[in-house]
Each structure stands twice: as structure tokens, then as C-alpha cells.
Design a protein with these regions (language model features):
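Hydrophobic side-chain positions on well-ordered alpha-helices
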Residues: 64-71
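Extended, amphipathic, non-transmembrane alpha-helical segments
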Residues: 56-64
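Long C-terminal interaction segments enriched in charged/acidic composition
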Residues: 1-52, 121-217
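Solenoid-repeat scaffolds in large eukaryotic assemblies
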Residues: 79-80
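Residue-level signature of catalytic and energy-coupling elements of molecular machines
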Residues: 75
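Amphipathic alpha-helical coiled-coil segments
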Residues: 90-110
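A cross-kingdom feature marking charged/low-complexity
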Residues: 111-124
Length: 217
């Protein structure tokens, strides 16, 4: 780590360049490590919000599942199918939330590693890609989370730019995209298994996760 970068890491620049105001308009100023710590805290806050949303969906899931079982036991298949369709949509959102949470957890772990190793550019580039993907998935479920994740992504992008200028390192976009896709794929796989383990299967003949029952003509 160069002396210039080490100083920027812990203390920040003492001089104010002419372009400071322009830079501050697109990314927060200041030393890198506190900005990383801020990003970690903001992501952890989003994880907490996702946990609360997951709890709400879980309660709704249990309620609808009970109605499905009741309708099924009374051989009221049209009513059971209506509830099953609703439950299928809820479980898709639950899976989306779980996927986002797991991906954000991986980003937090990486950011905390960066604070120890100073490997800013190569670690943060995949993190930004993951945030963009998670953000797009949250658009229809939590618009406020979409906005916050976009701001966090901008914060990390600013850190990457500053770190690159200080160290002379450049982003390997191919490697960054591969790493980001690996994180997202692993999160999706784990999320799917967690949903299966968490919630009971529907009675035979009714839709499972991600499926919808045919509507009555």
C-alpha cells in the first residue's frame, strides 16, 4: 500500500483541489475507511429491514396456508386454488427477500475484509455489481430499499474511483462480473433451499413455490 493511499485510507487529504466541489456532487468526500464503515452500517440496516419484511411475509404465509388446508379438507378446490395462487406469489417474494439478504450479507463480509486488507478495487467492484442486481429485484417489493441501495452503490463507486486514483489499480470488469455472478448464484441456491426448509409443501395438486394454479373458467 503506497504512503499516499495509506494516508487517504485513515486520514484523508489535507489539501482541497479545485475539482473538490464537482467530486462531492457525485460521491461523498473524506477518507476511505470511514466511508467503507458507513457503507457497512447502511447495508446492515437494509438487512434488518429485510428481516422484518420476511417476518411479515412468514406470518401471512402461515395464515394463507391454513386457509388452503381448510379448503382442501372440505374438498373446495376452487377456493383452495385461489389461496394457493396467492401463496405462490408470496413465496416468490419471500424467496426474493431471502436472496437479497444473503447477497447483502456477502457484501458486508467483503467490505469488512477490505477494511483489514485494503484490497479496495478488486473487492468492491463485484460488490457494486451485486448491489445493482439486488436493487433491481427490490424495485417492486421495497422501493425505499431500491433508493437506499442505489445510494450505497454510488458511495462504493466513489471509493473505487478514489482508491484507483491513489493506487493506480484498474478494474478487471470480466473478473468482477464473474465474481458478482458467483455471489448471486450461490445466494439464489441457498435462498431456494431455505424457503423449502422453512415452509411446508402444499397438498398434492396445488401449486408449489413459483407456480400458479390454473384459474377456473
Amino acid at each position: 500500500m503506497s504512503g499516499k493511499f495509506a494516508k487517504r485510507w485513515e486520514e484523508g487529504y489535507d489539501q482541497t483541489p479545485l475539482t473538490t466541489k464537482v467530486k462531492e456532487a457525485i460521491r461523498p468526500p473524506g477518507p476511505l475507511k470511514p466511508r467503507l464503515d458507513l457503507a457497512v452500517r447502511r447495508i446492515e440496516l437494509q438487512i434488518q429491514r429485510l428481516d422484518k419484511a420476511s417476518d411479515r411475509f412468514s406470518e401471512r404465509d402461515k395464515s394463507i396456508f391454513a386457509r388452503i388446508v381448510d379448503a382442501y379438507s372440505k374438498h373446495d378446490m376452487p377456493r383452495a386454488n385461489v389461496f394457493a395462487n396467492e401463496l405462490a406469489e408470496i413465496r416468490k417474494m419471500e424467496k426474493m427477500i431471502m436472496h437479497a439478504r444473503l447477497a447483502l450479507e456477502q457484501i458486508v463480509l467483503r467490505l469488512k475484509t477490505v477494511s483489514e486488507l485494503g484490497d479496495v478495487v478488486t473487492t468492491l467492484a463485484p460488490a457494486v455489481s451485486v448491489l445493482r442486481s439486488v436493487r433491481s429485484g427490490m424495485a417492486t417489493v421495497f422501493p425505499e430499499a431500491e433508493t437506499e441501495l442505489g445510494q450505497i452503490g454510488n458511495l462504493l463507486s466513489g471509493i473505487i474511483i478514489d482508491a484507483g486514483q491513489s493506487t493506480g489499480l484498474t478494474i478487471n470488469f470480466e473478473s468482477a462480473n464473474e465474481d458478482a455472478q458467483k455471489i448471486l448464484t450461490e445466494a439464489a441456491t441457498v435462498a431456494e433451499q431455505k424457503i423449502k426448509d422453512k415452509f411446508p409443501e402444499l397438498p398434492a395438486g396445488l401449486p408449489s413455490i413459483g407456480e400458479k394454479a390454473p384459474t377456473e373458467a
